Amino acid sequence: MPQRPEDIPPHWTVRSIIDALKRAKPYLRERYRVRAIGVFGSYVRNEQGTGSDLDILVELDEPIGWDVVDLKEDLERILGLPVDLVLKGGIARRPRLMHAVDEEVVYA
């Protein structure tokens, strides 16, 4: 399991988050069948504040059931930030929401 790097900046940037997700991708792919992972929301818009959570969009190869809870916890442990996890399949039937997320998501 990838460990949180010791040199994590106190203030994450989108680039540092994407880099951390890229490093974690092989593990996430093997463990959770993650096809694609990206960041959207306040961090992408550089509007995050103290206590902001990190909005992460994940596309899976197949449903993982309750393992989604473990995925969220792993992402929080890897990044050291609270994560709001959104599954792409879960918002696909909400076209406006999907469009808004697609407009700003930055993939790892």
Residue locations for each model-derived region?
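Short beta-strand->loop micro-motif that forms the acidic, two-metal-ion catalytic signature
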Residues: 55-58
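Conserved histidines in hydrophobic membrane contexts and catalytic metal-binding motifs
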Residues: 39
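Catalytic core of pol beta-like nucleotidyltransferases
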Residues: 1-36, 44-50, 60-108
